[in-house]
Amino acid sequence: PDGVEDGHWRHNKGKKDLNRDWGFFTQPETKAVEVELEKFDSTDQLILFLDFHSTFYNRFYIQHESEMSKLPNFTKTWLSRSKELLEDYQFSVDPRLSENNGVSKNYIFTKFKVPAITYEVGDETDRELVKQSSITFAQELMKILLE
């Protein structure tokens, strides 16, 4: 975000964490995305949402199993197939109930009922492993979507 210039790694110049503004849309950056999302209709559908971040560990935040999406087995299938191919890339999966807390994945899931996943890469993860795992995750994702 533009707040990085002032030392605010998670905030924009308005001192707002943009990943806590979804559904509220008080900032110009998230408001612009809301306007684009409103254009989706029955002929131009959103089917999946991935939100990329970095943090301490390789982790995927996903919907809780009690929350059904339009692609009910997508996330579980995608991550399990990928894990089989990624012997050297360790990651955890953290199911969470969707709350109205301004987080993008929760907003998207609640509004569109599509798999909405936060994809976290560890800050200290070897960059070559990140690159190779990203290729695997992308390939497995596309295979499932095309089945």
Label every PLM stretch briefly.
Residues 1-84, 88-92, 116-118:
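Active-site/substrate-binding loop(s) of hydrolase catalytic cores
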Residues 19, 60-63, 68-69, 94-147:
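Active-site-adjacent mobile loop/cap segments within catalytic or ligand-binding domains
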